[in-house]
């Protein structure tokens, strides 16, 4: 058990262009080595590419992509009587969002396209249309929770 107090969750200021805290959190989680301007440039380029392709509001597509990638259940390992069980638990709301954003970013980085903005635009577009790596990861997590439903009574 930690001996310190629980860390205070700080509010994130909304971004300048879309006035959205979700966008700012996404940019912060995409950032490497404190290079926020680079991360913002990549994100806004990706949003411009989405706007060109779909001629729709890119913020709406972004929110839909994050919403589609959110997991409802996940498994946590619990040790009971010398055996380890994968116990399905419900995911808290803030963890759902952070997992969805992390999966989108990770899968965008592994895509074969040229340039991160292009990769991110394609991954967001795929996630908004219920396909792509982030959605596959969410489905895998849900499948794992479904397979271990028998151990749900070990929940704590």
UniProtKB/Swiss-Prot annotation:
**UniProt GO cellular component terms:** small ribosomal subunit
Q: Which UniProt keywords apply?
A: Ribonucleoprotein, Ribosomal protein, RNA-binding, rRNA-binding, tRNA-binding
Per its UniProt record, what Pfam families does this chain match?
A: Ribosomal_S7
Regions annotated as coiled coil = none
UniProt-listed InterPro entries: Ribosomal_uS7, Ribosomal_uS7_bac/org-type, Ribosomal_uS7_CS, Ribosomal_uS7_dom, Ribosomal_uS7_dom_sf
Q: Which CDD domains does the entry mention?
A: uS7_Bacteria
Q: Do the record's keywords include Repressor?
A: no
A molecular function (GO) held by this record is: structural constituent of ribosome
GO biological process entries: translation
For the keyword Kinase, the answer is: no
The record's PANTHER family line, in alphabetical order, gives: RIBOSOMAL PROTEIN S7 (PTHR11205)
Q: Which family does it belong to?
A: Belongs to the universal ribosomal protein uS7 family.
Its biological purpose: One of the primary rRNA binding proteins, it binds directly to 16S rRNA where it nucleates assembly of the head domain of the 30S subunit. Is located at the subunit interface close to the decoding center, probably blocks exit of the E-site tRNA.
Q: How does it assemble?
A: Part of the 30S ribosomal subunit. Contacts proteins S9 and S11.
What is the protein name for this chain? Answer: Small ribosomal subunit protein uS7
């Amino acid at each position: 058990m930690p001996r310190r107090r629980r860390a205070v969750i700080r509010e994130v200021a909304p971004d300048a262009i879309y006035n959205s805290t979700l966008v700012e959190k996404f940019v912060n989680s995409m950032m490497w080595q404190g290079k926020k301007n680079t991360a913002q440039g990549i994100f806004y380029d990706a949003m411009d590419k989405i706007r060109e392709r779909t001629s729709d509001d890119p913020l709406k597509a972004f929110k839909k992509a994050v919403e589609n990638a959110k997991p409802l259940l996940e498994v946590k390992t619990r040790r009971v009587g010398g055996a380890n069980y994968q116990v399905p638990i419900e995911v808290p709301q803030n963890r759902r969002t952070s997992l969805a954003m992390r999966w989108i970013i990770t899968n965008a980085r592994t895509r074969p396209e040229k340039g991160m903005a292009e990769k991110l635009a394609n991954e967001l577009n795929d996630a908004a249309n219920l396909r792509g790596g982030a959605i596959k990861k969410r489905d895998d997590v849900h499948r794992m929770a479904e397979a271990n439903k028998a151990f749900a009574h070990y929940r704590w």
